[in-house]
């Protein structure tokens, strides 16, 4: 990591980011490098080529020990993940949302948590993670986004990616379609803790997969309903009626679902 940090510093403070998050029934892994354009390099360095090398290296050539992810590094990451999952109970707002999602999505792939589950962490091995990594390289759909570069630079980055893919026996799976949980009778679940402020999370479904032409209207509806300090929830439920400490809504197009989060008095 020290060598990588020095490398990024020499590239005028370039930034490497690796991020994973669920998107409906899919899991999205993003590897990106951000830095200044070649034209601003003081000594004419080919920065774009270096950025591509770092991003592709992180994606296709991770640090292995004996053919698997470094057991020591895996052990450290397991400890950190386990601690984060154990501490989640202390963030009742996040805990409430995760519990609601678990109830709402049930066994659907859309309900799989980004961080996984505490009971599964201890059993993870470097071999399992390595096998999952290679399966991802073989079956994942891959998109390349290049911003702020010339056509020639973009073509060079594309060729470098294709060269990496050529060495893999690829069999990409079809992209998962948007889903929606079926409509059903309301389900209520309550957990009791010794705390000053209670948390309320409500999830709603469209009942059918969201269509592309609906997206703009839904975004506007969310802003009006609970997505800003001028929304109906904020102005009426919080400011006028004083029924909560906070109240907001969000919408996920991949799953056709809306969430309303609020902090309330226990009596309410």
Task: For each feature predicted by the language model, list its residue ranges.
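Charge-rich, well-structured scaffold segments of protease-associated domains
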Residues: 3-172, 239-268
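Internal amphipathic alpha-helical segments of the cytochrome P450 catalytic fold
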Residues: 154, 230-234
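Generic hydrophobic alpha-helical scaffold/packing signal
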Residues: 222-225, 234, 238, 261
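His/Glu-based metal-binding/catalytic segments typifying zinc-dependent metallopeptidases
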Residues: 1, 141, 170-231
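Extended hydrophobic-aromatic, low-complexity segments
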Residues: 211-214, 232-233, 246-247, 268
